[in-house]
Amino acid sequence: MKIRTGWYSEYEYYVVKPLHNKQRQVLIMFAESVGGGRWNVGAGVFSCNVTYHSLTLSKVWRTPTSTNKNPSIITVKLALEALQEIEQVIAQDSQGKRRYIYVDGLDERRQRVYTKLLTKKYNYKKSTTKCTYCDLPMLYKRLG
């Protein structure tokens, strides 16, 4: 599923996993189009701002955009690997039990779109449970 987000970044893919530690951080893996068939793929650890229900950047890293004849093919492949990797991390952490995650799209529209992505494409289910730290709605998936 492709998500339109604005002129500066044509499409983005996000998967979010909370790291419910003392720093209240979340791990985000993403892929974003920068136009011309070029994509940035990356991941970041963000601090959860309880007051404003938003994410504050604390660390982020990206792969350099490929410069060969088919940049989009290679970098989209990396994007898919990033999404698979986050699924594996969640699966290992859950040990076959339900794993809850939450989505923060920085604004209400993005939050709805990311929630739809996870429920439709990645088979997450909506839950009445909310995030311990920021009261965002949780999604869950039985893994393993």
Regions flagged by a language model, labelled:
Residues M1-G144:
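Non-catalytic substrate-recognition and accessory regions of acyl/acetyltransferase enzymes
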